[in-house]
Regions:
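Short acidic/polar hinge/loop motifs at secondary-structure boundaries
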Residues: 130, 148-176, 194-197
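Short strand-turn segments of transmembrane beta-barrel domains in outer membranes
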Residues: 191, 196-226, 238-239, 244-251
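Flexible loop and strand-edge segments within Gram-negative outer membrane beta-barrel domains
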Residues: 244-251, 255, 269-312
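N-terminal periplasmic "start-of-domain" segments of outer-membrane beta-barrel proteins
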Residues: 68-100, 130, 259
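Membrane-embedded beta-strand positions of outer-membrane beta-barrel proteins
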Residues: 111, 192, 204-208, 235-239, ...
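Extracytoplasmic beta-strand/coil segments of soluble accessory domains associated
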Residues: 83, 108, 112-148, 170
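Outer-membrane beta-barrel channels and translocator barrels
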Residues: 138, 199, 226-231, 265-269, ...
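Non-catalytic regulatory/gating segments with a bias toward low-complexity or hydrophobic composition
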Residues: 91, 99, 111, 172-173, ...
């Protein structure tokens, strides 16, 4: 017959600590530190040690046999600004040079360069586009412009109605993985942050394009930068228009956008940034909402206004 036997080990429990001579720690004749190991570990933990990096970022540019150290690109994948190497999340950065080399026509074409980003487009030139990350849906990402959420609160179908043109963009940050803690519940699978260029000098740029099927487009940008005492000013205004009759039935579209950015910096102590944007487009949906009717049309209007204060 089997009998279950429980062996109970002797143990000591401390309800209080005493500094008397007969106390246990004093009898040992040694100094005992409680909890010092965890404190020391946290004080020496580096961001690089806990980072998840897809690829190692080399910030050195080799040209003509000489090495040039490039400036680090700060990303917004955390509460505090940090470089790509320090980010604890997978962050892909599409630089301005990448955009030039890709010869892209729209922002949606640029997003196709990022690993893990799925861009599904049912019209030309970025019309009616759905964007998703890592196999998620179009409602599970957040689109930001200079850190400001510009996602449509009603549906993710209109997330690509950007109020900026491709010429306004400095770089694009793609944050893969859950980011709801930082950017809200819609950032379930990630977030995309579009960072615009900051005016460094005075300049004017304009372009006009045209093609078959009544395609026409025009855009322009004006910027200026100057200093008054300890204040640094940077202003930029841009606008664009594009239309086409479409290569197939019910694929015509007409779209336009306008964007303005005002930046003020005071003696490297604080920055004030204000941005204002508007985007409008109308297009043929081409049986998107129902297969019963061939001719379907939709019109969307988006507006953006934000004011940000940053302390150094």
């Amino acid at each position: 017959m089997y009998k279950t036997i429980f062996n109970k080990r002797n143990s000591l429990k401390f309800n209080r600590f005493s500094n008397k001579g007969y106390a246990l720690f004093s009898v040992l004749g040694r100094e005992v530190l409680v909890g010092a190991l965890s404190v020391a570990t946290l004080s020496h933990a580096k961001a690089e040690g806990v980072s998840t990096e897809g690829t190692k970022v080399d910030s050195t540019l080799y040209k003509g046999g000489k090495a040039y150290e490039l400036d680090a690109v700060n990303v917004t994948g955390s509460r505090a600004p940090m470089t790509v190497e320090q980010s604890p999340k997978i962050v892909s950065v599409i630089t301005r040079d990448d955009i030039h080399r890709a010869a892209a026509q729209t922002i949606n074409d640029v997003l196709k360069l990022a690993t893990g980003v799925d861009v599904r487009q049912r019209g030309g030139f970025g019309v009616q586009t759905d964007i998703s990350i890592n196999g998620g849906t179009f409602d599970q990402i957040t689109i930001l412009l200079n850190g400001v959420n510009i996602s449509n609160p009603q549906t993710g179908h209109n997330a690509s109605d950007f109020p900026v043109a491709l010429a306004d963009i400095d770089h694009i940050e793609v944050l893969e993985g859950a980011a709801s803690r930082l950017f809200g519940t819609s950032a379930f699978n990630g977030a995309i942050n579009i960072v615009t260029k900051k005016a460094q000098n005075d300049g004017i740029s304009a372009s006009v394009e045209g093609g078959s099927f009544g395609s026409f487009g025009a855009q322009g940008r004006v910027q200026t930068a100057f200093e008054t005492g300890k204040w640094t000013h940077a202003y930029s205004v841009s606008g664009g228009y594009k239309r086409s009759d479409g290569g197939t039935d019910n694929s015509d579209f007409e779209k336009g956008q306008g964007y303005g950015n005002l930046s003020f910096s005071y003696d490297q102590r604080f920055d004030i940034n204000a941005q204002l944007g508007i985007a409008t487009q109308s297009y043929g949906a081409n049986t998107f909402y129902s297969a019963k009717y061939n001719n379907q049309y939709e019109k969307t209007d988006h507006g953006l206004a934000s004011l940000n204060l940053s302390l150094h």
